[in-house]
């Protein structure tokens, strides 16, 4: 769906964000990257990465019998991929910086963030180079959130911080769609009816958001 929407060009976009369920789906991430798009996904703490790209090699034949090895494997002595939470714990204190993530309903949301270039794991082998973005609350540094992003190495840190704050407005938009436009008030038995209801509701919400932006903000109920 993402690739088809992008190819159609009807709704220009560059970034795809999601929660840790999507962030822990390598096939989805690779398909997004193959479509020349960038992803920024939350990931579980047990997802593993290499801080540096490990050595790989095709094993040498061990005897005269049998077919030679053809598949690349980790070279002997190659480093082991580590969990993202272990990677975050190992960061020096100077790697963390205070940043304003977004303007929330209760004021600015400020957190400590750190940015690390790492190598993703794909079928036990090194995959793409990615950003690991770590975030922790100022008053609860043990509560870690981690994100993976395939943006280029020269991506400004400000862009990665901006991406950290995108989920709140998306969640707020879904909440408003439910409360004000009946996004979740459907009584259908099949996919087509649900799809039509959802599409028309989101279209109406898009119209209202454009109108609100044009008029400088509409009063809320």
Which residue stretches match the model-derived regions?
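An anionic, glycine-rich sequence signature occurring as long contiguous blocks
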Residues: 44, 49-169
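Short, solvent-exposed helix-loop connector elements
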Residues: 27, 149, 156-164, 179-196, ...
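Polybasic low-complexity intrinsically disordered regions
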Residues: 1-45, 55
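Hydrophobic multi-pass inner-membrane translocation pores used for secretion
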Residues: 187, 199-203, 212
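Short runs of predominantly hydrophobic/aromatic residues within well-ordered alpha helices
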Residues: 157, 170, 196-200, 204
């Amino acid at each position: 769906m993402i690739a088809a929407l992008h190819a159609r060009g009807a709704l220009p976009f560059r970034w795809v964000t999601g929660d840790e369920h999507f962030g822990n789906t390598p096939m989805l991430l690779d398909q997004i990257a193959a479509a020349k798009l960038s992803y920024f996904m939350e990931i579980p703490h047990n997802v593993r990465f290499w801080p540096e790209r490990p050595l790989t090699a095709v094993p040498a034949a061990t005897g005269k019998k049998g077919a030679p090895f053809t598949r690349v494997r980790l070279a002997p002595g190659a480093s082991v991929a580590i969990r993202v939470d272990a990677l975050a714990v190992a960061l020096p204190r100077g790697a963390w910086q205070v940043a304003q993530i977004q303007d929330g309903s209760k004021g600015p949301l400020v957190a400590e963030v750190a940015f690390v270039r790492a190598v993703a794991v794909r079928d036990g082998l090194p995959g793409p180079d990615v950003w690991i973005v770590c975030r922790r609350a100022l008053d609860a540094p043990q509560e870690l959130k981690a994100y993976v992003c395939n943006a280029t190495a020269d991506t400004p840190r400000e862009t990665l911080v901006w991406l950290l704050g995108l989920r709140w407005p998306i969640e707020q938009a879904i909440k408003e769609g439910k409360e004000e436009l009946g996004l979740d008030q459907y009584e259908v038995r099949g996919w087509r009816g649900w799809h039509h209801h959802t599409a028309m509701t989101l279209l109406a919400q898009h119209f209202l958001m454009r109108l609100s932006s044009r008029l400088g903000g509409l009063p809320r109920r």
